[in-house]
Amino acid sequence: FLLSSNLGEILTMFAAVLMGLPSPLQSAHILWINLITDSLPALALGVDKNDGKKLMGRPPRTASESLLANGGLSAICFYGALIAGISLTAFFTVPYMLMKQERADFSVAVLAAFLEQKKVLKRAQTYAFTVLGMSQLFHAVGMRDVRQSIFSQRPFENRLMLVAVGIGFLLQAAVTELPFLTGVFETLRLSVGEWLYLAGLSCFPLLAHELFVLLEKNGTQKPMEKFGRDAYESDRDQERAA
């Protein structure tokens, strides 16, 4: 959870730099996300009981197996890229809508020109900040059990997770709605329609989790596990050939 979430933050910033665009996040935004929307759910995941019977029924790891084997590394990369993708989508939404209104040709240069306007950049950063924060909360819910749908889990077995996610959403809303916090974080208030749009984007990590669980239950090998296993076997074959 933490590795994929932090990778999402890094990729969000790195992609904007490569495109020559202003930063989607301010330093205060990153600090807030790391302290609030990362830390609280991570603590809740750390004390999650999970299903002990199922865990004990799984075969043990071999001594030579990496901690990131069986799709672990692939999952980190996938969710990190997904979180970065939806955060950048939110960031681009504001200038894109203005470009559409003015019938301007879509290009990175035009996008950068619109983002040079202070009000446009401020709202775009608010969008990216909100999605990055909320998506990690949704992501934490799915990470309670990567092999089980959230509808099959028992949410009240980990009340700390409910509290962590609830507090996370309230605090994330506070930084865009409370005047004294909007001044500190340089954010703007959002309308109901904007909140619904950003919440919809933020759900994607959880939707991806449910999709992978569904594929696995239907007899399809878990995509992340298959990719990770293929990569491991490829590396092992190369070592043998050497």
Regions found by a protein language model. Give the residues of each.
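C-terminal transmembrane module of polytopic membrane proteins
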Residues: 3, 46, 68-70, 96-242
